[in-house]
Amino acid sequence: MNLKDVDKSEFTPMMQQYIECKENYPDAIVFFRIGDFYEMFFEDAYIASRELEIALTGKDAGYKERVPMCGIPFHAYSGYAEKLISKGYKVAIVEQVEDPSQAKGLVKRDVVKIITPGTITEAGLNEKENNFLAAIYETDARYTLAYADVSTGQMYLTTIEDEEALANEILSLHAKEVICLSSLKLKILNTLHDNYQIVISRCDDTSLIDDYKYLIEGLNLEKFKDDIPCISILICLLYTSPSPRD
């Protein structure tokens, strides 16, 4: 069963809630908290069942067919998430975001955390290795590369003239994830993803430009405006701990 081929209105309210979370984070495996388990549905269930070697079952959700499902104990999620991250996936954690005693009907749930290869800081992370998240920005026929280790807070910036040198620098960092604007077209991005399992995350150009303007003006960073990949990393790191939506 494919999520894109079904009508959301035909499902139970809880499954509609899951579908809304998945629609907001389509490139992540959604861990949807139900009681003492995180459950995955539809395509995510197929992927998680295969990659985590756990049983694939089904769930009655008001639809004419049972929805593909698999689940893991909530207290053990970090190990399962780390395994998915090591295989190049992203994980979105969905929790209840309101007090059940105050809820009118179904308790509201939303994504409270996103774990990616470049932002994982759980206990399972190898402390002997840097865990670099990199950002690329193209300007005036050159590339600015910013990279940060979110587990230590270290951040660096460099300018590179051509694609091949850029790829070599990223590989030398053993970067787990590269962030760039959606409009950036570089052949090396496919190579980094396909041959080296580096996750490529794209950020919306318009929203980031608005964020750059706010940060540059609000924090008096005008002299650093050509180095905005650093700012893009900060913005995308904030994005990995999303606030509940209204």
Report residues per predicted region.
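Charged catalytic and DNA/RNA-contacting regions of genome-maintenance
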Residues: 1-241
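A short, hydrophobic C-terminal helix/tail in secreted or cell-surface proteins
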Residues: 242-246
